[in-house]
Amino acid sequence: MADIWRDLTLQESDGSLFSDQSQFGDYRPNVIQNLLISICKATILKRGLFRGRMTSLILALGKGKLDIFFRGCAYRIFGENNLIEYGLLLNPKYNQSDLDFLLAGSDSSSNFLDIGSNIGLYSLPLAKSAPKGKTISIDANPKMKARLEFNASASGLKNVTMVSSAVSDKVGTARLKIRKDDVAIVAIEESAHGDIPIRTLSDIVKEQRLTSIYGLKIDIEGHEDRALVPFLMSASDELLPKRIVIEHPQADQDYPGCVKAFAALGYVLSGRSRNNSFYLRP
């Protein structure tokens, strides 16, 4: 990988270091924090370089963490370098079109897959919308398991299952790499000496006993072709997701293997957001 990638530190990846189990609400924003959050939400301060600095400032004016709600779901913000946290805290429309696309036409029994789930930006609203269905959250960083499970519990969601694993076209092990010191930008480097398990998506879906998938979101920093294509090309018709949100490497370009698979299986490009492409299977 390029020099901008480095190995994760123990602090960035060890889920056992998640020791704060205080009750959700103990870190609710104070008056000054709420004022600054409101200003950011209404201005350019919620974007770009401003958002990280404003998040740090807001957290410094309180207890160092924040308990907030986004789309009716509960999240604890820790203030580490995580662009997902910035968006959840400061932008009420964060990834709105992406989430709305996945949810369109779904019902209370719909099943969802969130590959590269981080702390649950997608997983929690999807699970909340389909309380009778299953939402399977997958992330290679063990630290995200503890964070997401805390957020799901605080949200009162019992239909979220967290799978702590990388996903690829074969079983193995990997090391985690991070870019821009941001725990939302993490990729795997396959290695026989790695301590992160790699599983196939087919194995995970089988283990979770899914019989249908309504929506799938995937954002795993360039590993999309190897993780998603083998599953799609071998899945039964019932298991092919009706809607897919996938990170695009460039504004008007998608991963070549996925593009071929989508075309072969009848998916059509429905739209794009700043970071993702939307595919629909009519």
Language model regions located:
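Residues that act as N-cap/strand-start positions at coil-to-secondary-structure junctions
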Residues: 60-62, 170, 190-192, 263, ...
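Hydrophobic packing residues within well-ordered alpha-helices of enzyme cores
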Residues: 126, 148, 176, 227-231
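Short secondary-structure boundary/capping segments
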Residues: 66-67, 193, 236
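Glycine-rich adenosyl-binding loop in Rossmann-like folds that engage adenosine-containing cofactors
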Residues: 71-99, 158, 163-211
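Short, glycine/acidic-enriched loop or turn micro-motifs at the edges of active sites
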Residues: 117-119, 142, 169, 220-224, ...
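S-adenosyl-L-methionine
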Residues: 2-141, 146-151, 155, 206-208, ...
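Conserved acidic-Pro-Pro-aromatic motif
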Residues: 4-5, 133-136, 203-282
